[in-house]
Amino acid sequence: MSTTISDSIASMISRINDIVITVAPSGDSNDSHRHSQIICDGGRTIQPLDDSSETTLAYADPNNPYLSNIDGDFRPIEQLSEEAAVEQATQLREAIREHDYQYYIRASPIIADRAYDILFDRLQALEDIFNLDTEASPTRRVGGEPLDELETVEHVTSMLSIDQSTAVDSVRDFDERVRDVVGDLEYICEPKFDGLSVEVIYEDGEYIRAATRGDGNRGDDVTAQVETVGAVPLKLHGDYPSYLAVRGEVYMPKAGFREYNRERIECDEKPFANPRNAAAGTLRQLDPGVVAERPLSCFFYDILDATELPPDQWTTLNDLQSWGLRTNDRISRVDSIDDAIAYRDQLKAARAELNYEIDGTVIKVNDRGNREILGATSRSVRWAFAYKFPPRAEITHITDIVVQVGRTGRLTPVALLDPVDVGGVTVSRASLHNPEEIKRLSVNSGDEVRVRRAGDVIPEVAEVTQKRATGTFNFPNQCPICHSSVEQDGPLAFCTGGLTCDAQLVRTIVHYGSRSALDIDGLGEQRVEQLVESGVIGELADLYTLSVADLSKLDGWGTTSAENLIQAISETQTPSLTDFLVGLGIPEVGPTIARNLAGTFDNFDAIIDADEAALREIEDIGPTVSTHISEFFTNEQNRAAIDNLLSAGVTPQTQQSTATTNAPLSDLTFVFTGSLSVPRTTATTYIERHGGNATGSVSSNTDYLVIGDNPGSTKRIDAERNDVPEIDETEFTELLAEHDDTLTWPP
């Protein structure tokens, strides 16, 4: 047997007690009776025997599905007592976690992949045969049962975005703003990963939940998917806090992406455009087993909440690493913005060498106290800035220019291109934005142009490199869909047809039923186009008068699919006021502003009647947004569409209207901190089910801060600042009984 194999397996079992592995000698692969034996004696002594040794202690079992085509096996499982199996499984879990830590965190694997697989397969066999599976077992990474759909969950604290720019002047402006408030400071500079941001929660060191960023307040529950990612530990390492919520970036390494796309092409499947799309698409798979087969990885870079928060970002990164949460090794601690700019330039030069995609750097204020002073808006933090790389660009030709009609009636010119690779993505269409941009570029079909991906995402025409066509594209004065007249609003052009324009109607209905609005399952764009083109739907309110007969006569519809859609639509007749406002498609009104509107006014009519001055008093609503809201509700076509929705039985529910005798906790807002007797998600669901609100951060609107074991300091400081009373779980139980003696805790 070769020294390399012997050394690898010796290392492999150095942490496992009283396990025997037999390995066929390399000299004669056909000799099934000659084995080298390696014994680990209580984890202390390793005794590899020479190649001439013979043993009958263990033989490869061709009927064992967990050990196929390998060089060795452990003692036959049927010879183990249940007690021995439990002990061996515990030892194997510890060994595999240690090897995961060495591989993902220290990047210094001490065993070969083949040897690791032997350990993993043995553990899986023990767990299946003796029913020993645990929540934190490494074998859970192979993926569980497929899900019916992705649930939406609320984050423990808002996952805010970061202001960004490719201009160095913007970076210096950020530095001046920060120093004006807090004076001298340190920055931590990190790569800006181009993947999918996730929140991961651990309780008592064990993996509990993972969710995508979503809108920053709520995201998709991807717990089953993320637990298959090898770089995400299911059990933390070292001296970890009892409660921990962290932020990381799931990504697909470049090498894995290339290999995965090669496999898709061989199977006649469409390849992914880039690693980010591949990672995002994979993580949203309903079958965790599919996720487990794809090459995802993860970097962690922030602590969102914990029983005790580190004093600064540098300590945060070191703590994450010590707990087995993989951090990036290209991080710098600097004193000046010049050094931060230099870091970005160095990272840009090294970008092609990295095995993961980045699109810039993130400059963060190091000290947590300074961060709290700087604060945040509802959208982004004020203590960090993303210095982006300039978008990649290539030269190609325009073959045609078409005009698209959006949901709000906005007309957008789009250049059709000879396909060109821009930063690893094949681009065949690029935005020309608006009529003014066409005039500025003096562009027409046939011209040679430079195309770039704005923000490394959206293709756009940057400039004409060679004029090959005569003149400039003539922008239409009629809508290309409904032929209504086109009106100019500054640099933008709009169709005046409103919801009588099929293009606007289709996009309006799709938006109304989207997950960020009323979340109508089965109401995708292709189905809506079919419903509009066939004349089954002529306006938004027609959704609520659809019948099985209407749908069954259309191609591709059966009785079951028709009944399912009608049921999904009927469940939205009493939407929350927030979701209804989002669904209406008011320009610039997303979930945050809709939530602020719903929380300020008593009912929907009050919002409709509010003047711009009253609207501007609301958080996050300035002159532009207030004008959009006011104009939307004074538009006759919009008012008619809303009246028809209300006549069809749609009744938006305010917080006040949902406060019934069956909602004993209505009007109460709770925040939890520390480890509770139940998972945080269970507590949140319980509060909401009984009419209350459970939020991730303390504000003046919070009624109670519920304190669990080992609570964090930030929420308690905020509670003291806002005069919010603190109660423990016992007092919380008593409070529930005061409101309704049928409420019990734990639920």
Swiss-Prot record:
Cofactor(s) needed by this chain: Mg(2+); Mn(2+)
Reactions performed catalytically: NAD(+) + (deoxyribonucleotide)n-3'-hydroxyl + 5'-phospho-(deoxyribonucleotide)m = (deoxyribonucleotide)n+m + AMP + beta-nicotinamide D-nucleotide
Residues binding Zn(2+): C479, C482, C495, C501
Keywords of this entry: DNA damage, DNA repair, DNA replication, Ligase, Magnesium, Manganese, Metal-binding, NAD, Zinc
One Pfam family in the UniProt entry: HHH_5
GO BP terms: DNA repair; DNA replication
GO MF annotation, one: metal ion binding
Entry-linked InterPro entries: BRCT_dom, BRCT_dom_sf, DisA/LigA_HHH, DNA_ligase, DNA_ligase_CS, DNAligase_adenylation, DNAligase_N, NA-bd_OB-fold
Domain BRCT: 660-747
PROSITE patterns per record: BRCT, DNA_LIGASE_N2
EC numbers, comma separated: 6.5.1.2
HAMAP family from the UniProt entry: DNA_ligase_A (MF_01588)
Protein name: DNA ligase
